Amino acid sequence: MGNSPSTQDPSHSTKKEHGHHFHDAFNKDRQGSITSQLFNNRKSTHKRRASHTSEHNGAIPPRMQLLASHDPSTDCDGRMSSDTTIDKGPSHLFKKDYSLSSAADVNDTTLANLTLSDDHDVGAPEEQVKSPSFLSPGPSMATVKQTKSDLDDLSTLNYTMVDETTENERNDKPHHERHRSSIIALKKNLLESSATASPSPTRSSSVHSASLPALTKTDSIDIPVRQPYSKKPSIHAYQYQYLNNDETFSENSQMDKEGNSDSVDAEAGVLQSEDMVLNQSLLQNALKKDMQRLSRVNSSNSMYTTERISHANNNGNIENNTRNKGNAGGSNDDFTAPISATAKMMMKLYGDKTLMERDLNKHQNKTKKAQNKKIRSASNSRRSSFASLHSLQSRKSILTNGLNLQPLHPLHPIINDNESQYSAPQHREISHHSNSMSSMSSISSTNSTENTLVVLKWKDDGTVAATTEVFIVSTDIASALKEQRELTLDENASLDSEKQLNPRIRMVYDDVHKEWFVPDLFLPAGIYRLQFSINGILTHSNFLPTATDSEGNFVNWFEVLPGYHTIEPFRNEADMDSQVEPTLDEELPKRPELKRFPSSSRKSSYYSAKGVERPSTPFSDYRGLSRSSSINMRDSFVRLKASSLDLMAEVKPERLVYSNEIPNLFNIGDGSTISVKGDSDDVHPQEPPSFTHRVVDCNQDDLFATLQQGGNIDAETAEAVFLSRYPVPDLPIYLNSSYLNRILNQSNQNSESHERDEGAINHIIPHVNLNHLLTSSIRDEIISVACTTRYEGKFITQVVYAPCYYKTQKSQISN
């Protein structure tokens, strides 16, 4: 396919026939095929067939006509040939033959080391050689052989654009070395053409086209050299190449380049200016490098940002705040908040600023949280020192005042109007004029708006010495206090509080009142359960509402209602049990007056009074507690609800009214009723029970003895007389049903014992009829209700008879 053979046939070198250049070109075209390489002995056969065709037919194949159209001045390599007269006119970039060798070996071996010469053909002339026994393997195709030589290194090729070797040197070199330069030339030709067409200086510098000489007319082709990608500026200001395949590119050099402001842009992104395929792994590597770069930038400038924002907030300078907001918006003169590469990519491509605003908000929240933690830690240190100085004084003031707490003045919090919506609640100073509540000054206003001061005391045993260890054991209170510490303390203190979480709260002994109490206990609204630990023994107090837990143990409980400043839970029943129970005529103690402000002033002012310490908590649907005296509590709640929750109204006791009249339902006799009214002297003596009067109260033996009249009437007759006067209702349905009796009879017949009578009723009652209330129809103005139970293998049926005057009432209504 364009390669001149290294050996010439002597029969054709001396004799030049007409049209021999077409045949030589055809043979030359066939020598580069797979058939010519595998079967070298068939070359003479091809030549003879070509000459025979030209002599007899005089026709030129189409491929020969194509070759004849060129100028026969040069050969395929662009130089004059002494062997042939066929030349090519214009030079071509692509060669026809890319085979590694065009000449056969001395021993006529092919590329596959195969020969087709037989034993009897050795030494014979070429004309007498028989055609080989193997047929052609297929159509002519180019032979390609893989090589291990590296074409990426331009230094080994010295940027050779044109093969400038002499003719002798080219003939001396092997075939694959003589034509290797054509590939390099084509590559550089393509790169130069693209470089000249592109006006961008960055594109020409990226391919190193400036260092290459000018292109001239060449007969060679080239393949672009694959160079390792490095960080190179692109046409976009925010895009760089992060896809680096060079393993020698260390991370230290990467950091050095990023530190240089001249070579690194702050808006480095993932998109690349080079035309290349981005698969999932390459994209993940690029994003990972972006995140590492941003993390290094954040760590290096986090301290600077925190100090700057803290300084701006402490001074309260509005200009600094506006400048910080402008810097967060994207100013290049000052330090800006780090923005992820994904957010910048979305902004550049689609104009979407959602991700950028989210990154800015996260950065602002992070810096303000760090500032608030520092402020809380400083305020906590001041609060602890202040509380240690005033705790004793406040405790004495509470004890001496007898818990008559005075209302506080309205709070005046100091609020910074320049705080954004992402800022955490700041510490607010509280001005107060009462020494009794000095301990409250150590609590921030955010907690004081939700929490209530709870006074818990132990009053049961006054003989407990001051040296006794008394604790309150409550997981509910401990969890509430833990949440308060997490809100007020910094991060390190909150971690310590989690480790030291203990449901035990120590109580302090009061020498004046001889009781134990818990100082400074502020709790949010809710229901709390607790127990008292006296020298390690868990017990409950009788002065607090009691309940039972899931295990059946007695516990105390109380409820904190919102809107109150101070409460002291205790049970009013304990005080009433210690005194003499009052009679119905005596007036019950009045409920203490409540000094409460209108609901509209809750947000601005708070109060505390003795009356707020409720003797009993209003009823609430707390299912985990079985409260004592729940009926009284429910009644009081209903009364309060009926009076529009007027807590100032006095609770009036209800008087019970008794009567000596017997209801008609229980009157059994001749219909005469006895009503006892007034004094006992007015009551007439009652007749003894008899057959005609109060038969229910009669003794059975006496009753039947009277009916038999001293033995004149037998027992059966007396029973018939009694049933005629007082008829007994029928049996329950399961004992007086023909259907059930028939089923029982069938079961008895199928049983093993056939000696029983057919009419016998099985005494075993179906279990579906047990513990069920059964009744019969109303007959003779009497209704009966029965229930059957099983007891130790026996069945017990209890029947209750009751009169029912349904017909009488119906007749009266009709009349």
Curated annotation (Swiss-Prot):
Its annotated function is as follows: Beta subunit of the SNF1 kinase complex, which is required for transcriptional, metabolic, and developmental adaptations in response to glucose limitation. Has a structural role, mediating heterotrimer formation, and a regulatory role, defining carbon source-regulated subcellular location and substrate specificity of the SNF1 kinase complex. Promotes the PKA-regulated relocalization of the SNF1 kinase complex to the vacuolar membrane in response to various types of carbon stress.
User: Describe its PTM?
Assistant: Phosphorylated by SNF1 in vitro.
Gene Ontology annotations for the cellular component aspect, listed alphabetically: nucleotide-activated protein kinase complex; nucleus; vacuolar membrane
Predominant cellular place of this UniProt entry's protein: cytoplasm
Q: Which UniProt keywords apply?
A: Cytoplasm, Lipoprotein, Membrane, Myristate, Phosphoprotein, Vacuole
Q: Where is the composition biased (Basic and acidic residues)?
A: 12-31, 72-88, 117-129, 587-596
Looking up CDD domains in the UniProt record yields: E_set_AMPKbeta_like_N
Association with SNF1 kinase complex (ASC) domain as annotated region, ranges: 724-804
| Comp. bias (Low complexity) | 313-326, 377-389, 433-444, 599-608
* Membrane topology, as annotated: Peripheral membrane protein
Q: Does the keyword Transport apply?
A: no
Name this polypeptide is given: SNF1 protein kinase subunit beta-1
Disulphide linkage map: none
Kinase-interacting sequence (KIS): annotated span = 473-716
Q: How does it assemble?
A: Component of the SNF1 kinase complex, a heterotrimeric complex composed of the catalytic alpha subunit SNF1, one of the three related beta subunits SIP1, SIP2 or GAL83, and the regulatory gamma subunit SNF4. The beta subunit serves as a bridge between the catalytic and the regulatory subunit. Interacts (via KIS domain) with SNF1. Interacts (via ASC domain) with SNF4.
List the subcellular locations. Cytoplasm; Vacuole membrane
The record's listing under InterPro entries reads: AMPK1_CBM, ASC_dom, ASC_dom_sf, CRP1_MDG1_kinase, Ig-like_fold, Ig_E-set
Single Gene Ontology BP annotation: signal transduction
Sorted alphabetically, which Gene3D superfamilies does this protein's record hold?
A: 6.20.250.60, Immunoglobulins
